[in-house]
C-alpha cells in the first residue's frame, strides 16, 4: 500500500527557512506561489520579460523577476512551465545558478524521467504534484483544507529531500488532505498512460466511435451527442464521488445489466493488449521523444489532428446544442 503523510508528518519551518522561486504562473504556478506566501514562505515568481502573467502576479502581491534572477536568489526552484519548454528554461535560466545544497522541484516528472534535464549531483531533485487543478488547490488552501499531493525524491543530495518535499507540500495545503510518496518514474509513466489510454485519448476515441456508430446508422446527430457525450458527465461524476459502486447503484438496472454484458465486448483483450503497447512506448521513451520532436518542429501533426477534431460532426453538433444549455460555459478556449 502507498505511504501516506499528513500535517503532523511535515515540518513547515523547513520550507519557511528557504528561498523559493516558482517559475511559471499558470494553473499550478499561481496556486503554489500564493499558498506558499500565505504559509510564511519567502517566494518570488520567475517570468520572462513580456509575460502576460506578470501583471496578474504583481496585482496579487507577489514579487516578479526574470527566471534567471529568481533562480539566482532562491535555493528551492520549482519549475512549473509547460513540459516541452522546461529543458530550455533550465538551460537558459536555472543550470548556471544552481549551487550545491539547492533543490530543484517539479510538478511532473517527464523531463527528469526521460533525461531532458540532467541536474548536477549536488542538488536535491524533488516533486510535489497536487492531484487537482491549480484553482482547486488554491481554493481548498484558502478554505483551510487541501488537495491530496504526491511527492517524490529522485536525487537526495542533502539526505533530507523527503523532509523538504513534505514541508513544501504542507505549504500549499497538501498534507491537510494527505500526501502519497511515489517516484519520478512511477508518476511520469502512470500519468502519461492515464492521459493517453483512459482520460483523454481513450475517452475521446470511445465517445467519437459511439457517436459515429449512431449517426452512420441514421440516428440524429443531436440525439447521438446527448447519449454518447453529454451524459458522460453524469456517469463520471458518480464514479468520482463513489467509484464504480456508486455509479452502478445510481443508474437503472437496465443500464447496469448493459454495463456488465456489453462493456467487455467494447474493451476487449485486444484493447488491453494495445494498452500494454502504449505503456511500453511510454516506458522506453518513444512517446516522450516523439512528442518533443513534434513540439520543436512546430506542431504540424498536432495542429492537423486538432483541426480535424474541431471540424468533426460531434463538435459542430455540440457547439449548437450547448447554446440551449444556460448552465454550460462554452467560452472559446
Curated annotation (Swiss-Prot):
Pathway: Amino-acid biosynthesis; L-isoleucine biosynthesis; L-isoleucine from 2-oxobutanoate: step 2/4; Amino-acid biosynthesis; L-valine biosynthesis; L-valine from pyruvate: step 2/4. NADP(+) binds at residues 25-28, 51, 53, 83-86, 134. It catalyses: (2R)-2,3-dihydroxy-3-methylbutanoate + NADP(+) = (2S)-2-acetolactate + NADPH + H(+); (2R,3R)-2,3-dihydroxy-3-methylpentanoate + NADP(+) = (S)-2-ethyl-2-hydroxy-3-oxobutanoate + NADPH + H(+). It holds the Pfam family KARI_N. Mg(2+) 2 binds at residues 191, 227, 231. GO terms for biological process: isoleucine biosynthetic process; L-valine biosynthetic process. Residues 183-328 form the KARI C-terminal knotted domain. The active site is at residue 108. One of its GO terms (cellular component) is cytosol. Keywords: Amino-acid biosynthesis, Branched-chain amino acid biosynthesis, Magnesium, Metal-binding, NADP, Oxidoreductase. Binds 2 magnesium ions per subunit. GO terms for molecular function: ketol-acid reductoisomerase activity; magnesium ion binding; NADP binding. Residues 2-182 form the KARI N-terminal Rossmann domain. Gene3D superfamilies: 6.10.240.10, NAD(P)-binding Rossmann-like Domain (3.40.50.720). Mg(2+) 1 binds at residues 191, 195. It is an enzyme of class 1 (oxidoreductase). Its EC number is 1.1.1.86. Its cofactor is Mg(2+). Substrate binds at residue 252. It comes from the Bacteria. NCBIfam families: ilvC (TIGR00465), PRK05479.1 (NF004017), PRK13403.1 (NF009940). Belongs to the ketol-acid reductoisomerase family. Involved in the biosynthesis of branched-chain amino acids (BCAA). Catalyzes an alkyl-migration followed by a ketol-acid reduction of (S)-2-acetolactate (S2AL) to yield (R)-2,3-dihydroxy-isovalerate. In the isomerase reaction, S2AL is rearranged via a Mg-dependent methyl migration to produce 3-hydroxy-3-methyl-2-ketobutyrate (HMKB). In the reductase reaction, this 2-ketoacid undergoes a metal-dependent reduction by NADPH to yield (R)-2,3-dihydroxy-isovalerate. PANTHER family: KETOL-ACID REDUCTOISOMERASE, MITOCHONDRIAL. This is Ketol-acid reductoisomerase (NADP(+)).
Amino acid at each position: 500500500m502507498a505511504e501516506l503523510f499528513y500535517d503532523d508528518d511535515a515540518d513547515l519551518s523547513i520550507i519557511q527557512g528557504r528561498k523559493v522561486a516558482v517559475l511559471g504562473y499558470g494553473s499550478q504556478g499561481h496556486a503554489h506561489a500564493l499558498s506558499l506566501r500565505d504559509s510564511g514562505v519567502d517566494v518570488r515568481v520567475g517570468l520572462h520579460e513580456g509575460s502576460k502573467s506578470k501583471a496578474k502576479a504583481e496585482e496579487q502581491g507577489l514579487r516578479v523577476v526574470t527566471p534567471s534572477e529568481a533562480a539566482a536568489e532562491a535555493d528551492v526552484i520549482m519549475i512549473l512551465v509547460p513540459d516541452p519548454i522546461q529543458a530550455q528554461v533550465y538551460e537558459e535560466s536555472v543550470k548556471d545558478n544552481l549551487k550545491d545544497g539547492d533543490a530543484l522541484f517539479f510538478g511532473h516528472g517527464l523531463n527528469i524521467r526521460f533525461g531532458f534535464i540532467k541536474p548536477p549531483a549536488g542538488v536535491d531533485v524533488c516533486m510535489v504534484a497536487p492531484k487537482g487543478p491549480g484553482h482547486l488547490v488554491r481554493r481548498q488552501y484558502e478554505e483551510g483544507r487541501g488537495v491530496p499531493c504526491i511527492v517524490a525524491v529522485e536525487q537526495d543530495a542533502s539526505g533530507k529531500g523527503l523532509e523538504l518535499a513534505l514541508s513544501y507540500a504542507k505549504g500549499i495545503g497538501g498534507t491537510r488532505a494527505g500526501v502519497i510518496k511515489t517516484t519520478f518514474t512511477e508518476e511520469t509513466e502512470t500519468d502519461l498512460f492515464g492521459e493517453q489510454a483512459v482520460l483523454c485519448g481513450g475517452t475521446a476515441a470511445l465517445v467519437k466511435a459511439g457517436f459515429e456508430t449512431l449517426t452512420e446508422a441514421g440516428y440524429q446527430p443531436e440525439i447521438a451527442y446527448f447519449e454518447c457525450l453529454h451524459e458522460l458527465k453524469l456517469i463520471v461524476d458518480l464514479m468520482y464521488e463513489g467509484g464504480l459502486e456508486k455509479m452502478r447503484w445510481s443508474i437503472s438496472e437496465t443500464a447496469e445489466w448493459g454495463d456488465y454484458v456489453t462493456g467487455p465486448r467494447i474493451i476487449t483483450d485486444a484493447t488491453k493488449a494495445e494498452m500494454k503497447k502504449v505503456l511500453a512506448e511510454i516506458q522506453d521513451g518513444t512517446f516522450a521523444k516523439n512528442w518533443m520532436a513534434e513540439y520543436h518542429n512546430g506542431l504540424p501533426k498536432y495542429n492537423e489532428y486538432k483541426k480535424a477534431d474541431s471540424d468533426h460532426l460531434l463538435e459542430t453538433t455540440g457547439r449548437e446544442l450547448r447554446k440551449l444549455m444556460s448552465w454550460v460555459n462554452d467560452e472559446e478556449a
